[in-house]
């Protein structure tokens, strides 16, 4: 797949450039057929400590955008697309947030999958991941990212609903098998929740993020 880029002008920030210095960063990655404004709507529920940056995925998908082609179109195409998205996000971090004191990721659905791919590619670059209704993509990856994750065990919040009609059971099972040995996992299952985020889940996410960005005593 050809290379892609993050549109700097489409990024929604919670703080001005002057107010971002010396603060942790939380990057929001939306789901398939959505846009940067979607997850940014969650920002009032999130802790104030991190600067929030909500990115727009680079591929057009209907009226919205996507990080990679759907798995239903073929695993190889999806993985190649996700790999290109990871390249684009890492390049964006280099130019837009080189001085962030730490970087966390929060992704929904396909954005959750990309957040885990970022963790696999650059395990030491990210402090934590919030994976909402997301999943891990199949297959092995080049390099030693997975082995390094097994050593580092970064904090990962994985929230999902029991009534999600979108994410296949096979993807859930694959994620359930993959995450525990490669993260310090906080798995939450919400009864009756579909492919969305509930207020209860948001409260749990806020507590999780707050614990990750709290100053060390």
Regions of interest found by a model, annotated:
Residues 2-101:
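Serine-hydrolase catalytic machinery in alpha/beta-hydrolase-like enzymes
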Residues 55-59, 130-138:
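Active-site nucleophile loop of the alpha/beta-hydrolase fold
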Residues 106-111, 115:
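Gly/Ala-rich beta-loop-alpha elbow adjacent to hydrolase catalytic centers
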Residues 117-128, 135-136:
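Conserved hydrolase catalytic core segment
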Residues 138, 162-167, 195-196:
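Acidic catalytic loop of the alpha/beta-hydrolase fold
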Residues 152, 157-160, 164:
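Short beta-strand/loop motif that positions the catalytic acidic residue
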Residues 170-217:
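C-terminal catalytic histidine-bearing segment of alpha/beta-hydrolase fold enzymes
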């Amino acid at each position: 797949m050809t290379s892609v880029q993050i549109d700097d002008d489409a990024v929604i920030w919670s703080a001005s450039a002057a107010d971002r210095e010396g603060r942790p960063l939380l990057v929001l990655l939306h789901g398939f057929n959505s846009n940067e404004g979607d997850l940014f709507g969650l920002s009032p529920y999130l802790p104030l400590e991190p600067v929030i940056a909500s990115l727009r995925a680079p591929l057009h998908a209907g009226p919205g955008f996507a990080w990679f082609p759907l798995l239903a179109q073929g695993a190889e195409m999806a993985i190649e697309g996700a790999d290109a998205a990871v390249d684009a996000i890492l390049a964006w971090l280099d130019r837009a947030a080189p001085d962030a004191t730490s970087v966390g990721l929060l992704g929904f659905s396909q954005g959750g999958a990309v957040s885990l791919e970022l963790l696999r590619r650059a395990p030491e670059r990210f402090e934590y991941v919030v994976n909402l209704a997301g999943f891990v993509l199949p297959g092995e990856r080049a390099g030693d990212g997975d082995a390094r994750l097994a050593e580092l065990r970064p904090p990962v919040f994985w929230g999902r609903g029991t009534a999600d009609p979108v994410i296949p059971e096979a993807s859930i099972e694959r994620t359930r098998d993959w995450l525990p040995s490669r993260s310090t996992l906080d798995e939450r299952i919400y009864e009756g929740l579909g492919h969305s985020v509930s207020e209860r889940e948001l409260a749990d996410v806020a507590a999780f993020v707050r614990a990750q960005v709290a100053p060390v005593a």
